[in-house]
């Protein structure tokens, strides 16, 4: 997330989208090789130049986001106004980020609210994963879910969804929305 890289990637996005300004520009992953000050200065320059209206961060832990906000405040730089993290019934590690977003007035977008399809009823104990599913194409992020404990939870979850007369995906999405 160095200055030159952020500027180049932003310019590329503007060109590909055929627009003069991005409404929201998110950094995707923390960069331990670049001081947060440098990243924020680069983002501030993009905002000051009118290329970006607002900035946010994806995949930061609460402590990293808090450090970024404190750095912005101390140096008078643009603040992250948005956070995006994985969040679902099966991945609640972003709770600290959610709490910080609420306290600081930041927006939050959960990604993978259906846990890569695990909360849709797609995956069944003892059955092969469906062709073309995330578990056949890119299993890495969700491999730890392939356990008896997860299947036990999913079976109870699917039973609850059925009792409510909704699909598991609907109940999972409702939970994410109500928990924010």
Annotated model-derived regions:
Residues 30, 34-180:
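Beta/alpha (TIM)-barrel catalytic core signal, keyed to glycine-rich beta->alpha loops juxtaposed to Asp/Glu
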Residues 2-17, 41, 65-70:
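Short, acidic/polar
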């Amino acid at each position: 997330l160095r200055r030159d890289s952020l500027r180049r990637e932003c310019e590329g996005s503007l060109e590909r989208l055929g627009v003069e300004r991005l409404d929201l520009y998110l950094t995707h992953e923390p960069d331990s090789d670049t001081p947060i000050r440098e990243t924020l200065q680069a983002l501030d320059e993009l905002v000051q130049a009118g290329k970006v209206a607002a900035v946010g961060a994806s995949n930061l832990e609460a402590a990293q986001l808090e450090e970024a906000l404190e750095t912005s405040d101390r140096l008078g730089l643009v603040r992250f106004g948005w956070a995006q993290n994985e969040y679902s019934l099966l991945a609640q590690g972003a709770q600290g980020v959610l709490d910080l977003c609420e306290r600081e007035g930041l927006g939050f977008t959960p990604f993978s609210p259906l846990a890569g399809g695990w909360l849709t009823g797609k995956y069944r104990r003892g059955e092969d994963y469906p062709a073309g599913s995330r578990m056949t194409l890119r299993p890495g992020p969700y491999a730890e879910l392939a356990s008896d404990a997860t299947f036990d939870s999913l079976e109870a979850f699917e039973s609850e969804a059925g009792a409510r007369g909704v699909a598991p995906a609907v109940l999972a999405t409702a939970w994410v929305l109500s928990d924010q």
